[in-house]
Amino acid sequence: MNNKKIEQNKIVEYNSNLDIQPRELNTLNGLVFTGATVSIILPLIGTTAVVPVVGGVIGIIAALLPVIWPAGTSSNDNLFDAVMKDTEMIMDEKISEYVVNDAMTRLESLYNILDYYRLSKDFWEKNKDDPLAIAELKERFSKLHSQFIESMAYFKRANYEVLLLPAYANAANLHLLLLREGLLLNKVIDNFITEGLHYEEFKTKRSTYIAHCSTWYNKGLENIKNKTRDFNKINKYDAYMNLSVLDIISLFLSYDPYQYDKATKLQTLTRTVFSDPLQRAPRDLYISPKEETLFKNLKGLRAFFAEGDLVLTGFRNYFRNTYINDQIIEGDLFGYTTNNERYKLFTDSKIYKVTVFIDNVALAIVKLIFHDTDNKEWDFSKTDITDINKYRKEEVYLNLLSNNEIQKEPSHYLYKMHHYGDNYNDSYLFQWIHQSISPENYLFDKDKDDNYIITQIPAIKASELSNLGELSLQAIKGPRFTGGNVILSSVSKIDNNDPLYGGTIKIPLLTAFNNTSKFKIRIYYAANHNYNHDYIGALLTINSQHVANFKFKQTFSGEDYSNLSYNNYQFDYLVQTVAFPQNTSDVTLNLQFFYDPKFLNDYKQIVIIDKIEFIPEN
């Protein structure tokens, strides 16, 4: 057993102090764009991501106004103007002056009504029993909702859908937050809205906004690949749209105030992105450097240097999976080995920046310094830098907040280092993951203020997938709205003598509470067939003991899962509540699938698991 002490309050505070940051220009290795989009979603990815009572997220609209419009309505210095200009640069296309002016006029009107609504809500907060204050708030809410419906059309103008996509995603984000706010206000103000109608509208708009963003992201990516074989341009589009569009829509699921009626520890954004390559861009447009694998935490590096000129010739990454007692995993070799090597394991802190020194003559790396959040520097080199004129210095990081906040609260941490090409001076790539994704799978029941809290764990943070018979479990690329990779279970009917086909998704947990706690568990998934108690099903075990059944339902037809929509995924709860022991790392959650081959259908049976959520019993 791991004797590491689990301090509940300390764990709950992990990644919880996320303030809205002022908009700054930031650099993605040569790509300059605004960080305001990320500032908008930061309050929604910490421990206190979703607050179930008036206050907190109910006030998120007012809190976001100075982020989106830092200089007020009269200035073009606003989020929407910035993201439109950024997208023009990425796509190397211009939005017509007419479309821009039309959108900005609409935005000015939207800002005025947003501020108009904010003032009314501020007044109501101080006069909650005043019927006139309530009536005024209702009226202004209704006007703002109508204004959003009318305004969304201006962010999807024909022939400009891709160029306007980040602006559309941010407007959709604000509209859904407003609709969510209305549902929450209805809990404390009688008949504030027509609840059933309003909730259906919330769900419809959410689905519509996700579909639009997913469709036009794909079309934009296809379009840019048809125009160029330049990896830099393609990577810039992918990184920028992931950060400014897909990350936003991936959080829309959590805006539902009925499903998320408690504070929630979100770990949605497991999707990784690349900063610009160092040295030459990869030669092959169709390389796929993002592996569809289980999540791993970078723990160290082994670097190899040439015997004579001491330039970097190769390296290996070292990882640990989410089981903290497991051995360090040795990654693939990039380049080639020598007898000159440096091997170092990082501490439990995360790497937020890499400083690289490149020989100006050999055009090869001679020194790597990895910087972590505990002020440590990990130097991988076999030479001292004495004549700075002989070398070029590059600082590689992916941070979308103020440059002054890079170390204090980086938006992304290093996930993996890559190399492409046959020579040591070919392309080096650095892969990054969002800072909300913790290395382990902590399970909470309450936050530091003793409020119940929902814990979300992506299926991709399993430590192991195991198969029995003809069933296959594997990590695959998730749809645009899930936030990252997902787990696919597939099995086909084959004539053999196997008595059973099966598979297990193994998820290690660290429980962070002082007494045994019971949880309801729900799973977000898609499936092309139904659970059947007699010969098809899924169950949950804890340390090999059966604790609950997962009765999944068919959500889509056919065997093609490559283009599933948001409406093809759903939550279902396990039948039983599950008790977990307190303060231990000796808990393994196993989601097991089983099929009797004699009763399989003729088509491939598919279940796709995105995330598992744990809701403590009050």
From Swiss-Prot:
This is Pesticidal crystal-like protein Cry17Aa. Disulfide bonds: none annotated. It comes from the Bacteria. One of its GO terms (biological process) is symbiont-mediated killing of host cell. The gene is cry17Aa. Belongs to the delta endotoxin family. It holds the Pfam family Endotoxin_N. It is found in: Secreted. Not significantly toxic to mosquito larvae. May increase the toxicity of the Pesticidal crystal-like protein cry16Aa (Cbm71). GO terms for cellular component: extracellular region. Its main location: secreted. InterPro entries: Galactose-bd-like_sf (IPR008979), Pest_crys (IPR038979), Pest_crys_dom-III (IPR005638), Pest_crys_dom_I (IPR005639), Pest_crys_N_sf (IPR036716), Pest_cryst_cen_dom_sf (IPR036399), Pest_cryst_dom_II (IPR001178). GO terms for molecular function: signaling receptor binding; toxin activity. CDD domains: delta_endotoxin_C. Keywords: Secreted, Sporulation, Toxin, Virulence.
